[in-house]
């Protein structure tokens, strides 16, 4: 049923609905080009409140503090490249302290990422960074979504 449902809705909407199902009530965010659809989906869900901050590191620390205080899941939404790398200290804090958080980073169009060009470049797309490689050692799970139909499995 979920796989059928995902074909008629945006991935961004599905992600936000899953956050609500996981008990998330607040998402700490800095909007950007890479999160356009995610920010739109967040704004449309009545059960989620967007908390906009001025820096990605603030968002990551806010998500960690919120999760600790609420004894639940903290959520952070940031854009691509430098925006995602700005969250790494908060990600590490969550990892070291065993705090449950989800850090969602926007991404460029797949054909504009170093993973898909086949060219040995440090960056290819606008504000791109291979955030998955950077955070894999300090997370339980890090993934770059490459096919919309994989979102159900990724969010599980």
Regions inferred by a protein language model and the residue ranges of each:
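N-terminal alpha/beta PP-like core and its mobile active-site loop of ThDP/TPP-dependent enzymes
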Residues: 2-156
């Amino acid at each position: 049923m979920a796989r059928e449902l995902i074909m008629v809705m945006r991935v961004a909407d599905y992600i936000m609905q899953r956050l609500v199902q996981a008990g998330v009530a607040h998402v700490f965010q800095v909007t950007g080009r890479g999160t356009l659809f995610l920010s739109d989906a967040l704004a449309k869900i009545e059960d989620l409140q967007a908390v906009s901050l001025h820096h990605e590191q603030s968002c990551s620390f806010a998500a960690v503090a919120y999760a600790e205080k609420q004894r639940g899941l903290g959520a952070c939404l940031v854009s691509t490249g430098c925006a995602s790398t700005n969250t790494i200290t908060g990600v590490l804090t969550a990892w070291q302290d065993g705090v449950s958080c989800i850090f969602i980073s926007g991404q460029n169009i797949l054909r504009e990422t170093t993973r898909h060009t086949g060219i040995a470049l440090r960056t290819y797309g606008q504000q791109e960074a291979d955030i998955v490689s950077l955070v894999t050692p300090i997370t339980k799970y890090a993934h770059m979504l490459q096919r919309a139909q994989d979102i159900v499995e990724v969010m599980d």
